[in-house]
Design a protein with these regions (language model features):
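Hydrophobic mid-bilayer segments of alpha-helices in multi-pass membrane transport proteins
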Residues: 11-27, 49-58, 176-177, 181-193, ...
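Intrinsically disordered, low-complexity non-transmembrane regions of multi-pass membrane transporters
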Residues: 1-17, 168-209
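Membrane-embedded alpha-helical segments and adjacent helix-loop junctions characteristic
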Residues: 31-106, 200-262, 270
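Alpha-helical transmembrane segments and their lipid-water interface positions
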Residues: 51, 55, 98-102, 132-133, ...
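Membrane-interfacial helix-loop connectors
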Residues: 83, 91-149, 232-312
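Hydrophobic core segments of alpha-helical transmembrane domains in multi-pass membrane transport
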Residues: 18-28, 56-62, 153-164, 224-230, ...
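Juxtamembrane and boundary regions of transmembrane helices in multi-pass small-molecule transporters
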Residues: 2-4, 83, 137, 141, ...
């Protein structure tokens, strides 16, 4: 009997694009009436994020082509603690949800900004901004709104300084990615050359970085928003409320965990949490649930997983869960 060797290339490895195609096909097969709503939700969310993606990839490509990324990375040397504080405070003003912040995190990491300030902005930004502060106050009261704002900055500081302490473990946080393959290589960088378009090698780097990073972010954020659409449609809020009606440590921690699949952006969350509290959710559990959902939703986790190495991903989840639980417990004791 003759064995026929099977080439590995005959079975291409699944990619995120396969899942992007498979999700609408599965919805069309099992719930055809929902297909239009799922696609519309994902398209609207992605359309709202496209300006951020464009800004981020232009920034990355421009900095790479000019050689300025080294100067930006050097600007944080010896100033990391101050940068963490500023990043946590700025995160409270930036109107980004947990998915919209991903392009900017990719840009900061790509140009060598240390993980401490990046993590501070990463954790604080999805939690609060001035418009959502007003919306939260209207739905849940100023005590809850101020508590969430303070929690956002505190979580940013906690995550930033924790990551600074662990920075020796993460010398290369980004996952390796395929370059554009143009063969030109990056130009030798000394002083930044701001008029990069006058040099053929730097124009090539700009075009390559623009294409590679643009496709990368578009792919993973498309997947993230399709997952978000599924979460919103098929995960009932009422099913979660019955599990988190108490005030104890376990209940608050469970609320932080359950907040992850129940995607909560900073504008829709207050009305949902108000309804959950009317069904018996405690204030401490509600705070943990809201923070856990804003920082570590499944769509955001999918995008983060594609961006950083597994060790950084695990720390990101651990900081989000720990911070959400602590915020809930402290808020419960105060109110």
């Amino acid at each position: 009997m003759v064995e026929i060797p099977v080439s590995r290339r005959a079975l291409p490895r699944p990619t995120a694009w396969w899942v992007v195609v498979a999700i609408p096909l599965a919805v069309a097969l099992f719930d055809p009436a929902a297909l239009g709503g799922v696609l519309d939700f994902a398209a609207r969310a992605l359309g709202g994020t496209l300006p951020y993606i464009l800004a981020a990839v232009l920034m990355i490509a421009g900095l790479k082509a000019t050689g300025a990324e080294r100067a930006i990375g050097a600007a944080f040397e010896g100033r990391e603690s101050r940068a963490i504080v500023l990043a946590a405070l700025m995160g409270g003003l930036a109107p980004f949800c947990s998915c919209e912040v991903i392009p900017f995190i990719a840009g900061l990491l790509a140009v060598g900004v240390p993980l401490g300030p990046v993590m501070a902005f990463w954790l604080a930004s999805p939690l609060i901004d001035p418009p959502s502060l007003a919306i939260t106050a209207g739905a849940l009261g100023w005590d809850f709104a101020i508590g969430k704002a303070v929690s956002a900055v505190a979580l940013g500081l906690f995550g930033g300084f924790a990551m600074k302490a662990l920075s020796g473990l993460f010398t290369d946080p980004l996952r390796p990615r395929q370059s554009g393959g143009c063969g030109c290589g990056a130009p030798k960088m000394g002083q930044p050359v701001w008029r990069f378009w006058e040099h053929a090698d730097r124009r090539a780097v700009f075009g390559q970085e623009l294409r590679v990073n643009g496709l990368f972010l578009l792919k993973w954020l498309t997947l993230a928003y399709l997952l978000e659409a599924l979460m919103v449609r098929y995960v009932p809020a009422g099913a979660i409320a019955g599990l988190v009606g108490g005030d104890g440590v376990f209940t608050v921690a469970l609320s932080a965990v359950l907040g992850m699949p129940a995607y909560l952006n900073s504008y829709a969350a207050p009305a949902l949490v108000d309804g959950l509290m009317a069904e018996g959710m405690s204030a401490s559990a509600a705070m943990a649930f809201m923070i856990g959902g804003a920082v570590s939703s499944i769509p955001a986790m999918a995008a983060v997983w594609s961006l950083v190495r597994p060790q950084v991903f695990a720390v990101y989840l651990g900081l989000g869960f720990t911070g959400a639980t602590l915020a809930g417990l402290v808020f419960g004791m105060i109110v």
